[in-house]
A protein has these predicted regions:
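Beta-strand/loop nucleic-acid-binding surfaces
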Residues: 22-40
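Walker A/P-loop
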Residues: 192, 197, 202
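Conserved beta-strand/loop subsegment of P-loop NTPase cores
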Residues: 83-90, 113-123, 145-150
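Glycine- and charge-enriched low-complexity intrinsically disordered segments
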Residues: 3, 79-101
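Histidine-anchored nucleotide/phosphate-binding helix
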Residues: 100-115
Length: 335
């Protein structure tokens, strides 16, 4: 029988079967997916075949988002599979989300051809100086082509603006975010403490996941979500007896996948010559470089270096590019 993995708990998986029922399933110790080495051979969003409570097969994935499990680790971890977009939740402060983390995540989305949206949360806590920093960050990423949204998950009814959704009079954060998520499977990710769980609870109007406080000592987030889980936003149709073998998405066209907060983001299997392809503005500039194999580090006639001097490419983005380039030679990453 076929179904959709909607929750992982480490040792087991909850599968929404095509008849609408949920089943707790397991995988055998030697279960692996060909060509992918990861700590979790099955991920939320996978379509699977189940027999007697065992996951026997995983259908070919349309896409997935993967990262290195921990610093200096050779293991990888799949955050989610078969998604339409990623909503990366970031904060200018409380805690600070580094541009290195943002850029590494965005580069991975580019590599796996997954649309990425930046949602800046906790804007109600920002000082005037931090609000100016927020405006600069939004301008930077929107100039590259990424959609951004700024809000407070504690007050989704407050006025807001985003780069593509309607900014008509009366528009608020709730309507803007509902527009972004409608009809799509969206992965929510970000550092610990940025408010993913708070946002999820606010969208559903009830406590789906526990929220936590920020550590006073280091202003770092503390994990509250411990496992990945998919939540369906709305019902489209009522299931009838004759529709017992249809995908859950037939009845729930919009879904959010909540994932545990992560500290750093290590890229997987990036070839050195491909890294620039995952930074759109660097890739565009590279077409004017003197050498086709330019790494944009110290070669003469490098158009990327010239764009940095003129301010057309942000130094923070270039530094993130260099850090990933370093991954390809040393096999490590820094958050």
């Amino acid at each position: 029988m076929k179904g959709l993995v909607i929750k992982t708990t480490g040792s087991s998986y909850i599968v929404r079967m095509n008849d609408g029922s949920d089943a707790e399933c397991h995988v055998k110790g030697n279960f692996r997916i060909r060509g992918i080495r990861s700590t979790n051979p099955v991920a939320v969003g996978d379509f699977v075949t189940v027999e007697d409570g065992w996951i026997m097969d995983v259908e070919d994935r349309r896409n997935y988002i993967i990262r290195k499990s921990t610093n200096l680790s050779k293991e990888s971890h799949i955050l989610a599979a078969n998604i339409d977009q990623v909503a990366l939740i970031v904060t200018v402060n409380h805690p600070v989300t580094s541009t290195t983390f943002i850029d590494r995540f965005l580069a991975t989305c580019e590599a796996y051809r997954v649309r990425a949206i930046l949602i800046f949360n906790k804007i109600d806590l920002l000082t005037d100086e931090e609000l100016a920093q927020l405006a600069d960050l939004r301008a930077l990423y929107e100039s590259i082509g990424y959609e951004t949204l700024a809000l407070s998950a504690l007050d989704l009814n407050s006025a807001t603006s985003n780069s593509e959704a309607s900014n008509a009079e009366g528009s608020n954060a709730r309507s803007a975010i509902n527009s972004l998520f409608a009809g799509k499977v969206t992965l929510l990710s970000g550092n610990s403490g940025v408010g993913k769980s708070t946002l999820l609870n606010a969208l559903f109007g009830r406590e789906l996941t526990r929220t936590g406080k920020i550590s006073d000592a280091h202003d770092k987030g503390m994990h509250t979500t411990t496992f990945s889980e998919m939540y369906f936003l709305e019902e489209k149709n009522e299931r009838t007896k004759d529709e017992g073998n249809l995908s859950p998405f037939t009845f729930h066209p919009s879904a959010l996948i909540d994932t545990p907060g992560i500290k750093g983001f290590g890229t997987i299997d990036f070839e050195r010559e491909e890294v620039s392809h995952f930074f759109p503005e660097i890739f565009r500039a590279s077409q004017e470089c003197r050498f086709s194999n330019c790494t944009h580090t110290n070669e003469p006639g490098c158009a990327v270096q010239q764009k940095i001097i003129t301010g057309d490419i942000a130094i923070s983005r270039y530094e993130s590019y260099l850090s990933i380039l370093d991954d390809t030679t040393e096999g490590k990453y820094r958050a």
